[in-house]
Structure formats: structure tokens, C-alpha cells
Regions:
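Helix N-cap/capping motif at the beta->alpha junctions
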Residues: 29-38, 59
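His-Asp phosphorelay/catalytic-motif detector in bacterial-type signaling
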Residues: 44-46, 70-78
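Two-component/phosphorelay signaling modules centered on CheY-like receiver
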Residues: 10-28, 96-97
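Alpha4 helix (beta4-alpha4-beta5 surface) of REC/receiver domains from two-component response regulators
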Residues: 61, 84-101, 110, 114
């Protein structure tokens, strides 16, 4: 699997990189939404872990950008966030074709990896 992590927290990206590569998967990371969009345009990913709360260009901005370019439905996005978004707001986001799940931080890393593998296999 080729997984993209978009998160402004370098420590989280380092942890994800370590665990995901130990499981035998490829991991690419972006520290902000703009870099994440650029990577999505250049490569194909089996899954995208997307933080909602990032400065300057948030996860919501990433989702809107993908919607406008008609690329959202092609993605398998797992919202991975400590955002204060309500369950109702998350439910609205999950109605978008490319958004498959939401996991709130903090999370057991094994639960996260299992969710990523489940989302990838589900299509």
C-alpha cells in the first residue's frame, strides 16, 4: 500500500512513517494541505490520512480543492484529527464520496493501521 499522511505535526508523521513502513507499506508525508494537494496531483495513493486542523491550508481546504478538481471521489481519505469538529460536522464530511472514515486523535496506532487496511480493501 502507498499511504499519504497530511498533518502539520512532524512527530505524528514520524510515528506514522515508522509504523506504516514497519508493516511493509510505503508512506509519503506532507506537513501542510498545499503540499498534500501537490502530492495527490503527482501520485496515486491507496489511502490518505488527513488532519483537519492545520494552519493556513486546512484539511477542509484540501477536501474543497479536491472537490473543485473532481478528484475527491477518486480518493480514500481517512480523517485523522484532534479537531474540535462535532460528530454532526464529521458525519456531513463523511457523506462526500472520497471520505471513508474518521479517527480521532489520540488513537491506538494498531487501530489506525487496521482502519487504513480495511478502507483500502473495501474497494
Amino acid at each position: 500500500m502507498n499511504i499519504l499522511g497530511i498533518d502539520d505535526n512532524e512527530n505524528i508523521l514520524k510515528l506514522l512513517n515508522t509504523v506504516i513502513t514497519m508493516k511493509g507499506h510505503d508512506f509519503t508525508q506532507a506537513l501542510n494541505g498545499k503540499d498534500g494537494i501537490k502530492l495527490i496531483e503527482e501520485q496515486n495513493f491507496d489511502a490518505i490520512l488527513l488532519d483537519l486542523a492545520m494552519p493556513e491550508f486546512s484539511g477542509l481546504d484540501v477536501i474543497e480543492c479536491l472537490k473543485k478538481s473532481n478528484k475527491l471521489q477518486e480518493q480514500k481519505i481517512i480523517l485523522f484529527t484532534a479537531s474540535s469538529a462535532t460528530d454532526k460536522e464529521i458525519d456531513v464530511l463523511l457523506q462526500n464520496d472520497g471520505i471513508k472514515s474518521c479517527i480521532r486523535k489520540p488513537v491506538d496506532i494498531n487501530v489506525l493501521i487496521n482502519k487504513v487496511e480495511e478502507v483500502v480493501k473495501s474497494s
